[in-house]
Amino acid sequence: MEKILVFKNYENIPFGKIFQIRFKEPMGIKKCPYLYRWTLIIFGYTTRLHHWLRSDDRRYFHDHSCDLISIIIKGKYFNVIPDKNGNPIKYLAEAWKPRFMKAEQRHYLDIPKEGAWTILLCSKPYHKWGFYVNNHKWRPLRYFHKFGIIQTEDYQ
């Protein structure tokens, strides 16, 4: 039986849709994750703590499901975005300098060997995220099924 938490305007919504906590989720390959993620979701808004060990998949740019503010609390990384011709441009992101990003902004993160820790403050999701292969959006499951996960132990 599913527990129901009742709030004004939130009657009959399962508790897990209103409030969730997730601890140290490994992202990527379990034996060598590229990222560990801690997540707090309250009424659709999300706060995340990320411990970056390796870079995002650099083969293609991706977007996100929501607008976000990213704050590096330890380390640094490069936020790589496409220019008007789709060529990558690297921007250094440093600790304690908040960065706002719209959900539709295509990018990937290039993480140095030292790794990085970030806090993400996320809006409610409103956009289906994916990878842009030859300017065509591929949803994550289809993308990884076709191209595989490349963040192995020797990937940086």
Model-based region annotation:
Residues 50, 81-83, 110, 128-134:
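A short secondary-structure junction signal
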Residues 63-78:
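Short, conserved beta-strand element in jelly-roll/cupin
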Residues 1-46, 88-89:
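A short, N-terminal "cap"/entry segment at the start of jelly-roll beta-barrel domains
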Residues 99, 113-121, 133-142:
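Acidic/serine-rich, low-complexity amphipathic helices located in mid- to C-terminal regulatory regions
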Residues 81-108:
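Short acidic-glycine-tyrosine-enriched beta hairpin
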Residues 102-128:
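Ligand-binding loop in jelly-roll beta-barrel domains
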Residues 46-64, 103:
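Conserved short histidine dyad/triad with adjacent acidic residue
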Residues 129-156:
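Active-site or metal-binding loop neighborhoods of secreted/extracellular toxin and effector enzymes
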